[in-house]
């Protein structure tokens, strides 16, 4: 397997609005990020994935871009960005931008022109359709933010497609001029010095045009936003992107690929690097979803399902393509509350167990801000405390349709809502968790547990979650076995324990992760009985023929 720097790296995702506020307006900003680069250097990460900082009216927290070559006013200026980039590079940290090119803001100059007339030069930058003969919508596609994916525009008496909010019209990637605009913009950022791109919902860019056929409807009566996943020209367009925007740069690229299958992922991220370095798949993020309600449920996962999914991706991409490893991001709730145990007794120990489980696999690990502290779900309590369009719209839609009660939906959005990941970073135990000045009002509520979960405490404490992540990252930097070794699942049917073996040549390690409060005994394979402990979340762990795994214990033994 060919060695590449991005395979050996650990990526840290920053959601700028919630990371660090330098000017007291309650909103995180670029200068706040710059002020915390030493913290990230101490953690040991190699790359920052920066969620969107471009000019935006902020309908969807920056994923609605009105100018790709300017900075959102709330985040600072281009000079602030340049200073952050230069400072990160001085500290040996690369910057990966969030590339949002399935859609723009409806306030982008392209769309402002596009909607003016049917013969405007920018008309075909977007996807416009008339109503059907009976006056109904062009098709039954739905927005992932609830409701239909079509918005009527009276100026030309036509509808435009938006797979997300109605302020996020989809670009028409079948137009070669649009593609060149995107490639030119990417090259502009690469010339500025950025090190790569995380590509938002990139699997959705190619639609089945001109037909745009109806699809199977979901719970709300519309076909879901995966209607255009892995479309007819997506691989062709990404190969063109590689040739026209990425070929001259040693970049890191990861595609967020909604609806991606294992076979499709092999095409996106195959080792010949004609498209992307790796993809984000979401199958393991649906492990606790419900057939009826989709993600809007509070049900717990069955560990055996998780093992099947992650093992299929580990084995399926082995020697063919490259995995992205993650529990959290800005769209997913906090992993320690979701997959671990966020009680005072087990929060830190289970956060370390989850980290061990994912960081010992083959692939590039991603750490989301606050994950390295074991940040938890936030008790939002009332709908007014939520900020995320997806949660608010789903609440109204599903309760008004009688599909779920208000009580059920409040529980569901409290458990699965994206705002769980977006509460302010907990820096210390001062007012507003040190995210913002004491007199500021943060844009979203601070989790009240910041007095006991914060970076200041954890950086100073040797047994903290932060220090454990630091050790895991250091181990990966030092070990080809962890980075490049093959993966084999053991104890397949065990409902409590996730265990697997990594192999590279004559080197081997075994990983045990107890996902439960149960104490369990396992028999260590003979080849490991003389091995050494690489890392464990219990200080007194020992190697023996039979290992007793305490609640949420993780242990890694190298032979």
Question: What name fits each language-model region?
Answer:
Residues 1-559:
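Active-site and adjacent substrate-binding regions of carbohydrate-active enzymes
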């Amino acid at each position: 397997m060919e060695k590449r720097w991005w395979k050996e790296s650990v990526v840290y995702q920053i959601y700028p609005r919630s990371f660090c506020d330098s000017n007291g307006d309650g909103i995180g900003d670029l200068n706040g990020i710059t002020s915390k680069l030493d913290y990230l250097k101490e953690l040991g990460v190699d790359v920052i994935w920066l969620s969107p900082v471009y000019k935006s009216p902020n309908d969807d927290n920056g994923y609605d871009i009105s100018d790709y070559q300017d900075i959102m006013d709330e985040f600072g200026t281009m000079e602030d960005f340049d200073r952050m980039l230069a400072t990160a590079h001085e500290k040996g940290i690369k910057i990966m931008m969030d590339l949002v090119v399935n859609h723009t803001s409806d306030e982008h100059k392209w769309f402002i022109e596009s909607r003016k007339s049917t013969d405007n030069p920018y008309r075909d930058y977007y996807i416009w359709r008339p109503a059907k003969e009976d006056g109904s919508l062009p098709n039954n596609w739905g927005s992932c933010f609830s409701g239909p994916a079509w918005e009527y525009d009276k100026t030309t008496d036509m509808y435009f497609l938006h797979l997300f909010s109605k302020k996020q019209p989809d670009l028409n990637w079948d137009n070669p001029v649009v593609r060149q605009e995107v490639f030119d913009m990417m090259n502009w950022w690469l010339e500025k010095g950025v090190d790569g791109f995380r590509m938002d919902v990139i699997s959705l860019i190619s639609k089945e045009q001109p037909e745009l056929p109806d699809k199977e409807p979901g719970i709300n009566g519309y076909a879901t936003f995966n209607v255009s996943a892995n479309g007819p020209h997506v691989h062709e367009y990404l190969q063109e992107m590689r040739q026209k925007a990425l070929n001259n740069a040693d970049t890191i690229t990861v595609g967020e690929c909604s609806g991606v299958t294992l076979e499709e992922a092999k095409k996106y991220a195959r080792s010949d690097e004609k498209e992307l370095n790796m993809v984000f798949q979401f199958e393991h993020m649906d492990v606790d979803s419900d057939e009826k309600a989709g993600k809007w449920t509070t049900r717990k996962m069955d560990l055996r399902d998780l093992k099947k999914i992650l093992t299929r991706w580990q084995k399926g991409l082995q020697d063919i393509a490259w995995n992205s490893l993650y529990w959290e991001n800005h769209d997913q709730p906090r992993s320690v509350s979701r997959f671990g145990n966020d009680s005072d007794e087990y929060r830190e120990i289970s956060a370390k167990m989850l980290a061990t489980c994912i960081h010992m696999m083959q692939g590039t690990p991603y750490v989301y801000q606050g994950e390295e502290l074991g940040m938890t779900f936030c008790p939002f309590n009332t709908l007014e405390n939520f900020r995320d369009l997806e949660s608010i719209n789903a609440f109204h839609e599903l309760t008004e349709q009688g599909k779920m009660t208000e009580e059920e939906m409040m529980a569901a959005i409290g458990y699965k809502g994206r705002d769980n990941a977006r509460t302010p970073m907990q820096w210390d135990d001062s007012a507003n968790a040190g995210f913002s000045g004491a007199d500021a009002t943060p844009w979203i509520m601070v989790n009240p547990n910041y007095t006991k979960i914060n970076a200041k405490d954890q950086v100073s404490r040797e047994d903290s979650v932060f220090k454990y992540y630091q050790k895991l990252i250091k181990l990966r930097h030092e070990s080809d076995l962890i980075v490049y070794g093959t993966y084999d699942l053991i104890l397949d049917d065990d409902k409590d324990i996730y265990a697997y073996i990594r192999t590279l040549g004559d080197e081997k390690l075994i990983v045990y992760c107890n996902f439960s409060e149960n104490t369990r005994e396992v028999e260590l394979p003979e080849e490991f009985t003389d091995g050494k402990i690489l890392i464990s979340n219990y200080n007194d762990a020992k190697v023996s023929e039979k290992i007793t795994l305490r609640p949420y214990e993780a242990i890694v033994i190298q032979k």
